[in-house]
């Protein structure tokens, strides 16, 4: 393998001659950052994780471990050291919240770990995708996200970019999976903000240097937003759409409001395509050497 000169990118030294990581565990644990409960529901403040995220991870052969959003720095570090990957879920949390602060602390840990040769993958869905997009800008403020129109309940096929077929995430996907994702209404969007493709691919920008855009979609106002991307130098993966919902959530507003559109999201092909993405992430987590201390 040709060995290139190490390159300075966003403060990280990246060596192109590093050997690809291999599988080191058959018992991966995915840390999921729990969110604060909705104060409008009343009662004491608690934390929660939507069950479909846990089910999706378990379906792909991993275990899920909650990481509390209000953990101390020491507790976040201890949790990070024991899990093999991090899942950032969807939600509607302010970027000025304690949850968002914990998110960025964990992402900095993941970046530092990978820089040090400690392989650690991250997946972000919807809000998690948006947080990872922001992280790629190199700063927590100001927000790089823009409003999207008509994307609450939008179920559409993906528009793949020229990078999709050669990406780490999709290069091993079957022709059937790629066809399902690109030709059928299977990706479930539930968002009012997004990372616009123009911003994430602008030449010379920190975002374009950090991420490779794999797929986009267009909102009702004609704005093209990023739907799927992966880190160029880090095992970070993001989807604006909710892949966990196809197999595990039923009779939700996004399908009841448009039953014809929602029906295709539950086909066997749709479920298989989303499980491919989840299983890929878990396969990445199997390369992490972190050890769950309860075993």
Regions of interest found by a model, annotated:
Residues 235-239:
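Catalytic His-Asp charge-relay segment
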Residues 2-227, 233, 243-295:
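N-terminal beta1-alpha1 cap of cysteine-dependent amidohydrolase-like domains
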């Amino acid at each position: 393998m040709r060995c290139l000169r190490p390159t300075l990118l966003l403060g990280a030294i990246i060596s192109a001659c590093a050997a690809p990581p291999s599988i080191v565990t058959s018992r991966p644990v995915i840390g999921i950052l729990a969110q604060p409960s909705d104060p409008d529901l009343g009662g004491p403040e608690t934390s929660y994780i939507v069950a479909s995220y846990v089910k999706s991870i378990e379906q792909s052969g991993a275990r899920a471990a909650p990481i509390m959003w209000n953990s101390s720095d020491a507790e976040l570090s201890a949790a990070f050291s024991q899990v093999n990957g991090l899942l950032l879920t969807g939600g509607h949390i302010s970027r000025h919240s304690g949850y968002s602060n914990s998110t960025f602390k964990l992402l900095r840990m993941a970046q530092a770990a990978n820089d040090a040769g400690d392989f650690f993958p991250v997946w972000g869905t919807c809000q998690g995708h948006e947080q990872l997009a922001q992280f790629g800008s190199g700063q927590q403020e100001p927000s790089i996200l823009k409003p999207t129109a008509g994307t609450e309940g939008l179920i559409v096929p993906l528009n793949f970019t020229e990078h999709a077929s050669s990406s780490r995430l999709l290069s091993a996907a079957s022709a059937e999976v790629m066809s399902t994702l690109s030709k059928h209404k299977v990706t479930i969007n539930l968002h009012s903000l997004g990372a616009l493709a123009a911003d994430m691919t602008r030449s010379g920008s920190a975002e374009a240097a950090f991420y490779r855009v794999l797929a986009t979609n267009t909102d009702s106002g004609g704005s093209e937003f990023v739907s799927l991307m992966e880190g160029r130098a880090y095992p970070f993966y993001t989807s604006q759409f909710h892949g966990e919902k196809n197999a595990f959530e039923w009779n939700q507003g996004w399908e009841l409001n448009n039953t014809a559109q929602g029906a295709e999201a539950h086909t066997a092909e749709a479920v298989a395509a989303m499980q491919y993405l989840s299983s890929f992430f878990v396969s990445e987590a199997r390369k992490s050497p972190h050890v769950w201390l309860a075993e």
